Design a protein with these regions (language model features):
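Protein kinase catalytic-loop region centered on the HRD/HxD motif
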Residues: 128-138
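Conserved beta3-strand ATP-binding lysine motif
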Residues: 51-56
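Conserved short submotifs of the Hanks-type protein kinase catalytic core
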Residues: 92-105
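Activation segment signature within eukaryotic-like protein kinase domains
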Residues: 122-123
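AlphaC helix of the eukaryotic protein kinase fold
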Residues: 57-76
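Activation-segment/catalytic-loop signature of the eukaryotic protein kinase fold
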Residues: 88
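Protein kinase glycine-rich loop
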Residues: 26-32, 37
Length: 302
């Protein structure tokens, strides 16, 4: 006899963590094969996003392992541009992540091209996060607009989410990805090879192109073979070069087919982006505002 599949909680309900806190569920923000995400309030009325993993028809232990892997990675990888996990727990056959509440995904902003200033600022934050992952020997493997969350404020803050298929390199040059969306495949992955730190730069190049132009550089309507052909033939890089813009020129290097001809790190990409007039002028102005403190002259005792 099989155990009944647990039901996802509903808006207006509550979930208690084994650690004690009770989380009150608000509206459902999204759902998918994994489960659902809710607005929620914490025990001190803090605003969180509650991600619920539902076993469904998959083996319980398999879903539990995925949930625990993502939870432990988010808990370990603390960075201002990576979504913060506040709590994670298992209750009544379901698995929960209590996450930092963001306002929306980057995907919801991509109806039109961004200003160059916004492209560079969002790229800066994402490159900062990708560099942090690389420094900690991780490849994200799933960099796209739906996995970038945005916090509104005086300036927009971008945060990477969903480390479920990220891979730890353990000092190796690459790792065989378990799954990668076809439209996100770097040439080395499309050829059946390994994800490397440069593979994340390729995926980020696709995303920066999309922010810069408002369209994705790969035609995803042509099926798997057509998508792979575009990646193999270097179509994304050619499109970036054809833009004839400073941002497009930098993106074209990120999208080179051979890893050794791409940038070597996210920091190296940023070193080129920050030289662009649209950012460097602002940088000079902000630097000029930093106060200079003169040391006090030494005093005589007595």
């Amino acid at each position: 006899m099989t155990s009944p599949i647990p039901a996802i909680p509903v808006s207006g309900g509550a979930v208690r963590s084994p650690r004690g806190p009770i989380y009150l569920l608000g509206r459902r923000l999204g759902s998918g094969a994994f489960g659902a995400v809710f607005d929620c309030l914490g025990p001190f009325d803090q605003s969180f996003a509650l991600k619920v993993f539902l076993p469904g028809n998959r083996p319980y232990e398999e879903v539990r392992a995925e949930w625990l892997k993502e939870a432990e990675r988010l808990y370990r990888l603390r960075h201002p541009n990576i979504v913060y996990v506040h709590d994670y727990f298992e209750a009544a056959g379901l698995f929960y992540l209590v996450l930092e509440r963001c306002d929306h995904s980057l995907d919801e902003m991509l109806q039109a091209p961004f200003t160059d200033r916004l492209v560079v600022d969002m790229a800066r934050q994402l490159l900062f996060a990708v560099q942090y992952l690389a420094d900690n020997e991780f490849v994200h493997n799933d960099l796209h607009a739906g996995n970038v969350l945005v916090v509104q404020g005086e300036r927009l803050t971008a945060k990477l989410s969903d480390l479920g298929i990220a891979q730890e390199l353990y000092g190796y040059g690459g790792a065989k990805p378990s799954i990668v969306q076809h439209r996100l495949m770097s040439p080395e992955v499309a050829a059946g090879g390994y994800s490397t730190k440069q593979s994340d730069l390729y995926q980020l190049g696709l995303l920066i192109y999309q922010m810069h132009t408002g369209v994705y550089p790969i035609d995803t309507t042509v099926g798997y073979d057509g998508i792979i052909a575009q990646i193999r033939d270097g179509v994304p890089r050619a499109k970036a070069e054809a833009l004839g813009t400073p941002i497009g020129d930098i993106v074209s290097v990120m999208l080179r087919r051979q890893e050794q001809y791409r940038y070597t790190s996210a920091l190296q990409v940023w070193e080129d982006l920050q030289k662009l007039d649209v950012w460097s002028r602002d940088r000079v102005e902000r630097t000029a505002e930093i106060p200079v403190f003169e040391p006090l002259p030494p005093t005589q005792n007595g």
